[in-house]
Amino acid sequence: MKGKIKMSTLKCKMCGGTLEINENETTATCEYCGTEQTIPKITDDVVGNLFNRANTLRLKSEFDKAEEIYNKIVGLDNTQSEAYWGIILCKYGIEYVEDPTTYKRVPTCHRTSYDAITADEDYKLAIQYADISQKIIYEAEAKAIDEIQKGILTISQNEKPYDVFILSLIHI
């Protein structure tokens, strides 16, 4: 039965559903949304609770607060690839939404950057500390996010400039 002991309960990064995590697993598939995803190394309940809190905040688009918690996790254990990945998701304002045609969870960017996600130091650290199965998922997600970012930047560069005036009416 080694490897089948219930280790910790975490929330899905995509939909917020409960993931049952077994010992030594580094990826899991959510039974609610079907997304295969990376999971953190849980060393104790404190770390598990911090990951769940950060994820909950990120799911509510409270990216700055979530990023603070991911940084706190890195302060406790600087080899947590999942914490670095969480920081990346917050920096780029990533929310996973359900595609109405495929029902798959796809990334949506609430924040745009001219820099590729793969050039970010936190991404490099996530890759450095990830195992092979986590790296595959991180690299695929980073590629998808980079494509979305490029699309957003292309659209914004093709927009005609316009002036915005703020008018205020003074009632006498």
Language model features with spans:
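Conserved small/polar residues in nucleotide/adenosyl-binding loops
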Residues: 170-172
